[in-house]
From Swiss-Prot:
GO terms for cellular component: cytosolic large ribosomal subunit. It comes from Mesorhizobium japonicum (strain LMG 29417 / CECT 9101 / MAFF 303099) (Mesorhizobium loti (strain MAFF 303099)). This is Large ribosomal subunit protein uL6. This protein binds to the 23S rRNA, and is important in its secondary structure. It is located near the subunit interface in the base of the L7/L12 stalk, and near the tRNA binding site of the peptidyltransferase center. InterPro entries: Ribosomal_uL6-like (IPR000702), Ribosomal_uL6-like_a/b-dom_sf (IPR036789), Ribosomal_uL6_a/b-dom (IPR020040), Ribosomal_uL6_bac-type (IPR019906), Ribosomal_uL6_CS (IPR002358). SUPFAM superfamilies: Ribosomal protein L6. Keywords: Ribonucleoprotein, Ribosomal protein, RNA-binding, rRNA-binding. PROSITE patterns: RIBOSOMAL_L6_1.
Length: 177
């Protein structure tokens, strides 16, 4: 039984939502997002709240119940406040810079890595060692941050590479003589 799925989702101030069949559409100050709920989950609007229920008591329907509610909460939060992921670059000569709409990364390769910014996401470089990814879609912001981190993930010996802000890297001890 989903404990999170039982709670109805209340609409934040300044956000309007509509439920049309299995599609939930949210409009807010930052933009508009749509989410198609799985067929095994029933979604309905009750006043200024969105209620999510499983269609039957099968294991798959109950497992998708809480996840559907959480994704609805995420689109409501996204159109109101948006989401942000911060990345840090550590290492000698490792740096980032914006080149038009593209992110240019110097990560110790023989060439610079150029990352094209997808639509719906904004990338900013406040310092050469910091990258900020912002957008209204939580999944897309996280995906872009993960793709940037994947170019040169933090290594365990010196901790060089691209990491999430606040991420702890488990360090290893080097070889001993």
């Amino acid at each position: 039984m989903s404990r999170i799925g039982k709670k109805p989702v209340s609409l934040p101030q300044g956000v309007t939502a509509t439920v049309n069949g299995q599609t939930v559409t949210a409009k807010g100050p930052k933009g508009e997002l749509k989410f198609v709920v799985n067929d095994e989950v029933l979604v309905k609007m009750e006043g200024s709240e969105i209620a999510v229920q499983p269609r039957d008591q099968t294991k798959t329907a109950r497992s998708k119940w809480g996840m559907s509610r959480t994704q609805i909460v995420n689109i409501l939060h996204g159109v109101k406040d948006g989401f942000e992921k911060k990345l840090e670059i550590t290492g000698v000569g490792y740096r980032a810079a914006m080149q038009g709409k593209n992110l240019q990364l110097a990560l110790g390769f023989s060439h610079d890595v150029v990352y094209e910014t997808p639509a719906g996401v904004t990338i900013a470089v406040p310092k050469p060692t910091e990258i900020t990814v912002t957008g209204i879609d939580k999944q897309q912001v996280g995906q872009v941050a993960a793709e940037i981190r994947e170019y040169r993930g933090p290594e365990p010996y010196k901790g060089k590479g691209v990491r999430y802000a606040g991420e702890k890297i488990v360090r290893k001890e080097g070889k001993k003589k």
